[in-house]
Amino acid sequence: RLGKEFYLGPVLVWDYARAQDVNKDYMYLFDGMSLVQRNYGVGASVQYDTRDFISNASRGIYAYLSQTFRPSWLGNDQAFSTTEFQLRGYKSVWKGGILAGERKGMFNCGNPSWAMVAELGGSNSMRGYYEGRYRDKHSMRVQVELRQHVWRRNGITVWAGAGNVFH
């Protein structure tokens, strides 16, 4: 912790992925890589957080930046590095109404393993697409959400998002 809202720290990662029951017609998607992937990485992250309540923020901002290196000397079959950023903002727009926005990106330098490429989709990212529906070397997305409190612990939300994966 570097201040009231500012954090800096190390990143240590170990990722394990195993593909099984793969149809031979889709083996080309693995680009000649092993169906079992282990990735080890080291790096650093910085975070700035002024949100009033982490799990259901109504005001403040959250910013995150990390850089992770996965070199071959750590035992990785694929040497690459990953830069990730996330920026979120929350603002009250009227009684019970919260406008939330998010911008997120992931960029790989080098040759990431099939298990570590950038993805779009899932319950928190580009809802409506299953997790990993879109995959490539890099991804960027933006989402905007309007939350309205209705009664007690009940509310409604409308949201829109756009994103892209690219090489």
Language model features: what each stretch is:
Residues 35, 42-152, 156-167:
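C-terminal outer-membrane beta-barrel translocator/porin domains of Gram-negative envelope proteins
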Residues 1-38, 43, 120-124, 133-137:
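Gram-negative/organellar outer-membrane beta-barrel architecture
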